[in-house]
């Protein structure tokens, strides 16, 4: 599969998952979750879904557990929205790039 097509599939999956998590997922353990990126394998059998979660470490852990528990529902949403041969098995991973950027900014400001 071409990299351009992979990029389009990843972006489409990110949009579908973002909408499903924020508007359709009713689990109270899911806090303020943002899907930051999706990386699918070339054969579209696996997808890593990177999410950032606003809150303390306990809230993050509960949100990640709830997302992993709801992976079947979210996978069906992807299958229903996208026309792709295989629906990827979803794996949710915590994305700490926002935290790291804030920490670096704080360190730079302290150094001035």
Per-range role (PLM):
Residues 1-47, 52-112:
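Charge-rich, low-complexity N-terminal segments
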């Amino acid at each position: 599969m071409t990299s351009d097509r992979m990029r389009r599939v990843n972006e489409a999956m990110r949009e579908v998952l973002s909408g499903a998590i924020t508007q359709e997922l009713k689990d109270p353990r899911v806090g303020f979750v943002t899907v930051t990126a999706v990386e699918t394998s070339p054969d579209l059998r696996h997808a890593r879904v990177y999410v950032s979660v606003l809150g303390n470490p306990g809230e993050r852990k509960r949100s990640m557990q709830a997302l992993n528990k709801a992976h079947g529902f979210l996978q069906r949403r992807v299958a229903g929205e996208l026309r792709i041969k295989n629906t990827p098995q979803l794996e949710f991973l915590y994305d700490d790039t926002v935290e790291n950027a804030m920490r670096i900014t704080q360190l730079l400001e302290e150094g001035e």
